[in-house]
Structures are given as structure tokens and as C-alpha cells.
């Protein structure tokens, strides 16, 4: 269900609260540049609280060069210098951009998968305005989102591993901190 909010911070915080209550990760679409940074505090809090979320905003990749697209003059000044994904990278789990309209669906699916993997957290996708305006038809077979992998061993796995190590002639265990 689409809910329009008048403020980006409110939208991000509503998505966080809804996810806490229902356990269902949410998607938030915010305005490019200023809207993204307006929601930054909420996005950072979601990252610290390990709340899975997909945050998206758009910018222009043609900067008004295509006369058929309604690109406003603000894009010429670089609403998001270096790309919006660079703005949010320090406070999201992963930040990327959608390369083309046909890849939008799979990019969103992949981002949703990543958001729900441990440690959970918000994922950012920069979806260029040109891709949002392009006509798109879903493929005949859309890939379903697989469940996030288990973050702890299932019953019996630890015992089976211990037995394998005990039975090994020269076991080697490599660990990292």
C-alpha cells in the first residue's frame, strides 16, 4: 500500500516502526538530494537498529540533455554531487544505483534480499528519473524473493561439525575476529 508523507524523516520513521511491529521490511521513496539527506537521521537510526529497509530516490543521468524528458534546471547544478549513493553510503548497509529501466525489478529484489540478511539494515538504490519515466512491462517469470538465510545453526549441525572435526586426521580451524 502506498502512503504519501509530507516529510522524508516521517516516511523513514514510519517504515521503521511498521517493520518493528510487523516484521515486514518496507520501501521508502524520497526526493533526490535534499529529501534523501532530510531522511538521513532516520536512515542512520534504522542502520543502528538493524531494521531492513529499501530507501530509493532519483536523480537525472541525462541532466536535461534529452529534450523529450521533463528535466528541470535544478539537475544542471548537480542536486547530488557525485551521485546520491555517495551521499548515503556512510550510513546504509549498501548503496548502489539502477543501471537501466529493465533491470529495476531485479535491482529492487536484490536490494530487498540484502536488507534482510544479517546484519539487517537499510539499503539505498539510486533510481534515475529517466528510468522512472520509462515504460516497463514485467517479464513473464518474475523471480520471487527467497527467505533470508538462517543466522544460527540448525539443530544437530554443531554436533555434526564437532564429530567431523574429531574424526579428522589433521583438522585445521581458521577463525577471524
Describe these PLM feature segments:
Residues 1-177:
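N-terminal alpha/beta PP-like core and its mobile active-site loop of ThDP/TPP-dependent enzymes
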Amino acid at each position: 500500500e502506498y502512503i504519501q508523507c509530507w516529510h522524508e524523516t516521517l516516511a523513514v520513521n514510519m517504515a521503521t516502526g511498521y517493520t518493528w511491529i510487523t516484521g515486514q521490511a518496507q520501501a521508502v521513496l524520497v526526493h533526490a538530494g535534499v529529501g534523501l539527506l532530510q531522511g538521513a537521521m532516520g536512515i542512520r537510526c534504522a542502520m543502528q537498529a538493524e531494521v531492513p529497509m529499501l530507501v530509493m530516490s532519483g536523480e537525472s543521468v541525462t541532466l536535461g540533455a534529452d529534450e523529450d524528458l521533463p528535466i528541470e534546471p535544478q539537475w544542471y547544478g548537480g542536486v547530488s554531487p557525485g551521485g546520491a549513493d555517495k551521499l548515503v553510503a556512510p550510513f546504509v548497509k549498501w548503496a548502489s544505483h539502477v543501471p537501466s529501466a529493465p533491470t529495476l525489478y531485479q535491482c529492487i529484489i536484490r536490494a530487498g534480499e540484502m536488507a534482510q540478511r544479517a546484519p539487517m539494515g537499510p539499503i539505498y538504490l539510486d533510481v534515475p528519473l529517466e528510468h522512472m519515466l520509462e515504460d516497463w512491462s514485467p517479464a513473464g517469470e518474475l523471480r520471487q524473493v527467497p527467505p533470508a538465510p538462517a543466522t544460527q545453526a540448525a539443530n544437530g549441525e554443531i554436533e555434526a561439525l564437532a564429530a567431523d572435526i574429531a574424526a579428522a586426521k589433521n583438522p585445521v580451524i581458521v577463525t577471524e575476529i
